[in-house]
């Protein structure tokens, strides 16, 4: 019903992500237990993957974007949504998912040519560790623009290597997609 009222993109931003913020708060204060939060999250995850599949956009000559979450990062809803937006705009999306070991990124960088890299930092991380990770990521993907987002990025405002760009919200990312 919500998706019928809004388009899928608007429903995600206006309804679902607001719901996740509330569910997260309820979970933190003990009003919702983890299985309830996982149930809601996985329902939405299924809808998001199905919506991405329904796009049915053939491979194009548009740039490719590699989407991944760093090791031990499991919060993939925003990453899935950004991947959906990229696909919707005709970009080739290579979605690696959660908790990708850094050494795997090194291997992928030599095997798969991409134009952009996109990752998110939601789990707690020290500012210095975040900055070190970004420097290492820049070394692995020196020619690509790297987009980063997430609560930890906003909280720490890390010093960014020259090819790294912070994405504050989905409207800003859509501007890059054209």
Predicted regions and their residues:
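Long amphipathic alpha-helical segments
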Residues: 1-56
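C-terminal regulatory/effector modules of DNA-binding transcriptional regulators
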Residues: 39, 45-178
